[in-house]
């Protein structure tokens, strides 16, 4: 391991240890509510509406490009922004899961294997996100967690897909 990377790693471990110790030493109940996650909203659409109308109503900018948008969700694209593939989504605000739904969804059996609840109107079984939404309350709560949702340019959301965050070389 490169010496500077080793030093960075050691500082990171020390910081995590200090944070963990600080949390453990915090007054009883102090952090329990902070780390619980969403226990209220099961509707992804309702969560998006609450964020739009009650949280970011006075600061409407997209996450990655800092592009402003109005109450009608019209985006002022930043200078130089172009897309060849997702043109219909370029001027549209969408809500991005910072941790992609697939990354937590694939741990649910309904996502991987389906559920008896998941059949279409012809009786054909289905699985994946649609099945997890329909049949698993924990998935719905996670999908609707407002700490994981941010407004983005639709074309950027489409391009990112379910990829994790990472560092890009300049």
List the model feature ranges, each with a label.
Residues 81-170:
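Domain-level detector of nuclease and nuclease-like folds
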Residues 30-91:
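Aromatic-lined ligand-binding clefts that engage carbohydrates, nucleic acids, or primary amines
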Residues 29-30, 64, 117, 130:
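The N-terminal extracellular segments of secreted preproproteins, especially immediately downstream
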Residues 2-16:
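Bacterial N-terminal signal peptides that target proteins for export
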């Amino acid at each position: 391991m490169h010496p500077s990377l080793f030093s960075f790693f050691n500082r990171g471990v020390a910081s995590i240890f200090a944070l963990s110790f600080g949390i453990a030493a915090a007054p009883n109940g102090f952090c329990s509510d902070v780390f619980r996650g969403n226990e209220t909203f099961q509707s992804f659409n309702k969560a998006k509406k609450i964020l739009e109308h009650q949280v970011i109503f006075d600061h409407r900018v997209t996450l990655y490009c800092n592009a402003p948008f109005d109450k009608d969700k019209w985006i002022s694209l930043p200078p130089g922004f172009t897309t060849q593939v997702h043109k219909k989504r370029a001027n549209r605000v969408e809500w991005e899961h910072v941790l992609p739904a697939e990354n937590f969804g694939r741990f649910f059996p309904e996502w991987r294997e389906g559920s008896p609840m998941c059949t279409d109107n012809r009786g054909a079984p289905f699985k994946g996100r649609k099945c997890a939404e329909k049949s698993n309350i924990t998935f719905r709560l996670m999908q609707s967690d407002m700490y994981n949702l941010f407004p983005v340019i639709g074309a950027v959301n489409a391009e990112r897909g379910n990829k994790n965050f990472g560092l890009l070389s300049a």
